[in-house]
Design a protein with these regions (language model features):
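Flexible C-terminal active-site loop/helix
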Residues: 5, 92-161
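Catalytic core of soluble alpha/beta enzymes
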Residues: 1-94
Length: 161
């Protein structure tokens, strides 16, 4: 109820979407979908592929946002992106833009990449530039996240545990 009321109140501001209006509860998402007058974006907090399938098949979102670590990495991202493509739902990525920009751009329904630079500057060989509000993907092979020699030395550890 609260999310639906907020969506109605926000509708006068011409916002792009309401993001994650509820946690990963399919029945709550269905209820909000029925009464929301705003587009919905969700997915960044979803882990299970079956939940993504249900959301896409039932058209419970206008934009599917994938969080690379939560959706089983690159393989999971690609599998779920194909589910969204099959259901004609635009694909967006959540965080880790350094890697997810190339993944999102690889799909015809790739729509938007969340740009939130949480890492120290100069950590990657690739530079990511923004032009006219658009984040441009690197123009070289790879996933777009090659660590610099300085970063490798600075953040090196002797063991994983």
């Amino acid at each position: 109820e609260q999310a639906a009321k907020i969506a109605k109140d926000l509708s006068v501001y011409n916002i792009t979407w309401i993001k994650e209006p509820t946690r990963n509860n399919i029945s709550e998402i269905e209820a909000i979908r029925k009464i929301s007058c705003l587009p919905i974006a969700l997915g960044e907090n979803i882990i299970e592929k079956k939940d993504f399938e249900a959301i896409c098949q039932k058209k419970l979102t206008d934009y599917l946002q994938l969080d690379l670590p939560r959706c089983a990495g690159i393989t999971g991202f690609c599998e779920i992106a194909n589910i969204a493509l099959k259901n004609k739902i635009p694909l967006c990525s959540h965080l880790l833009y350094e890697i997810s920009i190339g993944l999102t751009a690889a799909f015809p329904h790739g729509h938007m990449v969340e740009y939130d630079n949480l890492l120290p500057p100069g950590i990657f060989v690739e530079t990511h530039s923004v032009r006219d509000g658009y984040l441009l993907p690197p123009q070289r092979p790879g996933n777009g996240a090659t660590l610099t020699e300085q970063a490798l030395k600075k953040y090196q550890t002797d063991s994983f545990f």
